[in-house]
């Protein structure tokens, strides 16, 4: 069976392909000419139904502005219309030469920033996954023209390794390579994460070519070119972009970490199984009782550790209740100082996930915790 020949000669397939091409051409023409009535006629003619309700009762076709507009100026009559930024990237492009010259940077180099972005989403949903005001972490990496696809692959893999190093589980990540590209891109891929509502985009990696710098140069009338001392020529750099949502990352981490467990003794506990490198409190220092010199020893240990680790001191309630409190906020290590600690200078370290306990000398404590909370160590294991 020759499938290609069948597709090229079968009259039904040829007829349907011709119909698809005609519909696509009409839709494209209507979009370009902003003919909303023609778009509605096309919807009715093709008998398009809502995939959820099955209804054909469509509203009129309307324009949606996905950028927020406002006015700037103290006098309303003279106020100028401005738009809130839908991404942080353009601030980097505008300041590209300022940063390059002041920092004396040579290509390839990157500029990264974290900031707010605003999008007038038609439907904001799925908790903090899709919001109208959100935090972005973006990097624009400037490269020589012709080398962009090499660097695109480099950052695609580097960013994936970074996500894996956070310790949420390799099975929760996957790539989605774009077949249809934005007008500014010649390559694009998403890193998707398995949220409670399915795989969704967490980070985008794009090869933006020289589109942004060229557009700024065109409309500002100022050159946005880099002089390369190695090739002795000036050119507009190409750009590789990595763009990740901080709110989505927060959601990914916490939706993966939250757990309600039933223990062998029948009790239940709420535990936040945050990777140690991400835990806001890495170490809890807990004297067994509030007397007999145990708080004093615990505070001395706290003084030694607090400059290197995020620590919390707690002496209120029973040791069991304190363990549960630390489990609930995701503290990976609890250090207990008991009466024997005064004699042998050893403490008990309790591991959050397994609840196992280990007796270790105080002098080895820093090294044990340091290895567990090091991002460098995590990346080395990937």
Give short role names for the model-derived ranges:
Residues 1-382:
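NTP/phosphate- and nucleic-acid-binding module
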